[in-house]
């Protein structure tokens, strides 16, 4: 037999009969699913890698060094030396679909959307880089989603991955004043 997800519902399926007699049918609230991955530069170029590294390495969950000490190291040394070297490495794995991490995450979101159908709106986001977490949360809200299920795609919990993503999500929701 097939496994039925609790998210999967027919378009005509309504909320349980807790409504008064004669009340018109009420569709279930729209659910959004957000797959979150770490991130990738927008392109395998030194400028794009620099933007990505600045965002990634500025996260206090990733680098737990006092800001006063870390800022000159990041901006004076790392962001002036690593982007060119890292861009070369990204060029070696970049495909016609972009970064492998972005292409795979996009494919996972598309497959999940196909599986869930109209029962949910599935989007994908990167903690660092694009598509940006905040933009995708806004897209889910704009699509009428009243609930968002967030699925970090990291293989295990870590403060630098899962916690950082959930921190960013919480900050985005607070900025939107969405509860």
How would you name each of these model-derived features?
Residues 2-14:
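Short, Lys/Arg-enriched N-terminal segments with co-localized hydrophobic residues
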């Amino acid at each position: 037999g097939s496994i039925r997800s609790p998210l999967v519902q027919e378009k005509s399926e309504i909320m349980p009969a807790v409504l008064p007699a004669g009340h018109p049918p009420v569709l279930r609230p729209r659910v959004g699913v957000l797959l979150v991955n770490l991130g990738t530069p927008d392109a395998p170029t030194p400028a794009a890698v620099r933007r990505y590294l600045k965002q990634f390495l500025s996260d206090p969950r990733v680098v737990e060094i006092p800001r006063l000490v870390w800022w000159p190291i990041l901006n004076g040394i790392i962001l002036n030396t690593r982007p060119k070297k890292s861009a070369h490495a990204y060029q070696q794995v970049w495909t016609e679909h972009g970064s492998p991490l972005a292409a795979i995450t996009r494919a996972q979101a598309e497959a999940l959307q196909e599986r869930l159908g109209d029962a949910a709106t599935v989007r994908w986001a990167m903690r660092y880089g694009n598509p940006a977490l905040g933009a995708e949360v806004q897209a889910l809200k704009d699509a009428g989603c009243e609930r968002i299920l967030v699925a970090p795609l990291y293989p295990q919990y870590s403060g630098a991955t899962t916690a950082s993503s959930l921190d960013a999500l919480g900050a985005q929701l607070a900025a939107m004043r969405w509860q």
